[in-house]
Amino acid sequence: MEAFLQRIASRLGRDVRTSVERPQWKHAPQQTVFQGYSQNELLDVLKQQCTRIHTTFVETNSAELRDTLQQVIAAHGGGPIVVANDERYEQFGLSSFLQREDVYVWDATRGRDNIEAAERANIGMTWSDITLAESGTVVLLNNRDQGRTISFLPTTYVALIPKSTIVPRMTQAAHIIREKHVPSCINFITGPSNSADIEMNLVVGVHGPVKATYIVITDR
């Protein structure tokens, strides 16, 4: 091995390197994308990106969230609906929504029943933990009360997005995640499922939801 490395180094006109010298980058463009943008400006970026990723974009506020949610559910054909066991439903005044007969709340103690409920569901709904404006991506920090199947087995995916969760791009999301206890599963969801062949023929809904709606709560 030493002779092999020596031969390569001699061809390159230098000594064999035995350690790594990390480069000192002069530029870090990933840090400056949308730098200085306000939350309203990032919201506009997200809204525009949704037009490119086949995702319906809806704005509302806390007071009107319940009615908006009912309208979105009706537009997608109603239940069954599967949701995470998430305290934010109560925080946003949606506790009564969870009592609907067509709503199944994920229960970590019920094992396979959760997956079967997600398979039957027309709508899967989660809250976004971090939202990337640049790509229109919802970031889910999954846990025992929020299984992965909620967001990919139902026909339609609905994300509830407090405006405060919107950041410019993946760079900021990575910083936020590093400061947390990193979960075993982090999902990045960018609209409905997409697949394309070598000729770039795009097909929506092959490996997951056929439709997606983002509901942004603008005052939270």
UniProtKB/Swiss-Prot annotation:
Annotated family: Belongs to the LutC/YkgG family.
SUPFAM superfamilies the UniProt entry points to: NagB/RpiA/CoA transferase-like
GO biological process, one term: lactate metabolic process
Record's function text: Is involved in L-lactate degradation and allows cells to grow with lactate as the sole carbon source.
Protein name: Lactate utilization protein C
Source organism of the structure: Anoxybacillus flavithermus (strain DSM 21510 / WK1)
